[in-house]
């Protein structure tokens, strides 16, 4: 499973080559297409795509990449229409142009993991300003997340301790705008503050319920709260 940015870059490279065979996108074009601030982000995405087997560096051809496969959702349709063959992209890749390393054996299925972007910190306490920048990626077991788009957030605060969520934990969130009563959700309040709380309904209003008796349940009108996803997993590091 690819992150959204990895998938966007892979499809952009493949689409550019199809539309202009032999004319690769430059790093500036890739950076602008993905709305990234610097080229270093493109380097990291290309490396991640290579590690996941979607592209490879070509030996004996300076500054060349080969698109080996597309994500299943795109590859199937592509093969039906015209048959998919690897796409070769040549360009100025700097250090990325070195010959590819020897293939590594695939890990056993139970050890498979995916990269999930850590988007910032979220309050399990008093709401803090929402952070929407990709800080880094975290490796998450495939069986933890299942289908859908996911992101991760680092917990700040102790309002969810009775739900087993502690300060410093990393929570895995399935992106979505709906929730069922009892779900633990990322709630955006007044488009300004984000908090992790249990979702409840109180008549026509929305209640954000803590899992710590030191914190009061907060009630909002439905137009003030937007659901940004629901909790599906948690990662804790012991120091």
Swiss-Prot record:
Coiled coil residues, start to end: none
Pfam family, any one: LexA_DNA_bind
Gene3D superfamilies in the record: Umud Fragment, subunit A (2.10.109.10), Winged helix-like DNA-binding domain superfamily/Winged helix DNA-binding domain (1.10.10.10)
Catalytic residues in the record: 159 (for autocatalytic cleavage activity), 197 (for autocatalytic cleavage activity)
GO biological process: DNA repair; DNA replication; negative regulation of DNA-templated transcription; proteolysis; SOS response
InterPro entries: LexA, LexA-like, LexA/Signal_pep-like_sf, LexA_DNA-bd_dom, LexA_repressor, Peptidase_S24_LexA, Peptidase_S24_S26A/B/C, WH-like_DNA-bd_sf
Record carries keyword DNA damage: yes
Molecular functions per Gene Ontology: DNA binding; serine-type endopeptidase activity
DNA-binding segment(s): 27-47
Leader sequence residues: none
Site feature: Cleavage: 124-125
Keywords for this protein: Autocatalytic cleavage, DNA damage, DNA repair, DNA replication, DNA-binding, Hydrolase, Repressor, SOS response, Transcription, Transcription regulation
Keyword Signal in annotation: no
Domain of life: Bacteria
Reaction it catalyzes: Hydrolysis of Ala-|-Gly bond in repressor LexA
Enzyme Commission numbers on file: 3.4.21.88
Family the entry assigns: Belongs to the peptidase S24 family.
Function: Represses a number of genes involved in the response to DNA damage (SOS response), including recA and lexA. In the presence of single-stranded DNA, RecA interacts with LexA causing an autocatalytic cleavage which disrupts the DNA-binding part of LexA, leading to derepression of the SOS regulon and eventually DNA repair.
PANTHER family: LEXA REPRESSOR (PTHR33516), LEXA REPRESSOR-RELATED (PTHR33516:SF2)
Subunit structure: Homodimer.
Name listed for the protein in its UniProt record: LexA repressor
Organism field: Rhizobium radiobacter
Lineage, highest ranks first: Bacteria, Pseudomonadati, Pseudomonadota, Alphaproteobacteria, Hyphomicrobiales
